Amino acid sequence: MSEHNPRVAMFGGTFNPIHIAHLRAAVELREALSLDVVHMVPAHLPPHRSAPGVGSDDRLSMLRLALADTPGLVADDREIRRDGPSWSLDTLKSLREQYGDQTRLLMAVSYTHLTLPTIYSV
């Protein structure tokens, strides 16, 4: 019997606030790529922009409420629990430790390309 290797994506952002475009993009990503789970990861301390106006715990609570009835989308608090800046590379490494060597995908919201030069270890 073969072992199932889950297909996983990370969707990071400040989610300040979470809105329908975030949700629609995550659902479309999951469906189009036949993913098992999309980890929606609110940035605690985004290093490439100013701090969000809403606190991390409140943004996480809003995200959890928004995802409550959406299978395959998970509110992931790993960046909020981590001290220091919220580097996507660190989050991907953490997901790799959790899942092993299965598929990894990174989805970034559409405006990330504008700040790409400021993103750690590109």
What are these regions (language model features)?
Residues 113-122:
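Single conserved hydrophobic/aromatic residue that forms the stacking wall/gate
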Residues 1-114:
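Nucleotidyltransferase catalytic core that binds NTPs
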